[in-house]
């Protein structure tokens, strides 16, 4: 019975909405994960034990539906067998209603939900936006068959962009490469309101906020990933911009201030 309840709790589909003037953000919960501390890079045994005494960490896979300047945008698509389509339906949006998907990068837990159980486009009317460097890395260099198959379902509807581009009204792409070669974050602006959608700039806030130099084994370039994290977090602290992170504890929002060599929430 206890095992059943645990599975049930991990399978709950929940969402949360927040408004910041002209930006309405809905957090879409896809999956929970509990990796062990062996995936941390740059943290010694004492640090791991201090923040995770039982050796286990708690993580989320999230996506975000954002309404800005009259447009609804889905940021990332979750896992291939996840709950993003269900979450959207709970919020009054059918998969066919999604017209715009912006991807922070092409790891499975961010692009996988682009396809349904039959391998077809889960969002049949959507255009998919991905950075040029990210697409080149996974499609041209790595020739990842799963990425290729997913993007093929959106043939003619995959748009590439460069960091610094205004991808659409109120949305600018920022270079946060390191986790992957083409990883981007997005700076959203509507009037005086701002939001940063940061993808995998952080995975485990319990340790990576006080110790931002800690990376994860999934970072293609750990040193560059750390630099990107510090640069964007410093910017967010200075400008007091909230951040939406795909692996931040639900509902995935961070408001940070500097704390010594690291950061803390306020």
Task: For the regions a language model picked out, list residue spans one by one.
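Bacterial N-terminal signal peptides
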Residues: 7-15
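Boundary at the C-terminal end of the N-terminal hydrophobic targeting segment
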Residues: 18-20
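Active-site metal-binding loops of divalent metal-dependent hydrolases
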Residues: 29-31, 77-79, 106, 133-134, ...
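Metallo-beta-lactamase
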Residues: 89, 97, 124-175, 180-256, ...
């Amino acid at each position: 019975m206890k095992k059943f309840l645990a599975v049930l709790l991990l399978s709950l589909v929940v969402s949360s909405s927040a408004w910041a003037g002209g930006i309405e953000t809905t957090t879409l919960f896809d999956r929970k994960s509990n990796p062990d501390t062996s995936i941390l890079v740059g943290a010694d045994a004492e640090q791991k034990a201090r923040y995770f005494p039982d050796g286990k960490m708690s993580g989320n896979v999230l996506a975000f539906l954002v309404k800005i300047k009259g447009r609804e945008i889905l940021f990332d698509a979750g896992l291939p067998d996840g709950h993003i389509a269900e979450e959207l339906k709970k919020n009054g949006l059918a998969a066919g209603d999604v017209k715009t998907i912006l991807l922070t990068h092409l790891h499975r837990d961010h692009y996988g939900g682009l396809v349904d159980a039959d391998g077809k486009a889960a969002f049949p009317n959507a255009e998919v936006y991905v950075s040029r460097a990210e697409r080149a890395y996974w499609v041209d260099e790595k020739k990842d068959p799963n990425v290729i198959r997913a993007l093929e379902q959106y043939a003619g509807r995959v748009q590439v962009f460069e960091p610094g581009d205004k991808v659409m009204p109120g949305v600018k792409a920022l270079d946060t490469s390191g986790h992957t070669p083409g990883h981007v974050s997005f700076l959203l602006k509507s009037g005086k309101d701002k939001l940063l959608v940061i993808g995998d700039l952080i995975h485990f806030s319990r340790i990576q906020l006080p110790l931002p130099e800690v990376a994860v084994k999934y970072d293609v370039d750990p040193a560059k990933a750390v630099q990107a994290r510090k640069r964007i977090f410093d910017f967010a602290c200075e400008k007091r911009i909230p951040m939406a992170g795909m692996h931040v504890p639900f509902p995935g929002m961070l408001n940070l201030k500097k704390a010594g060599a690291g950061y803390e929430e306020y």
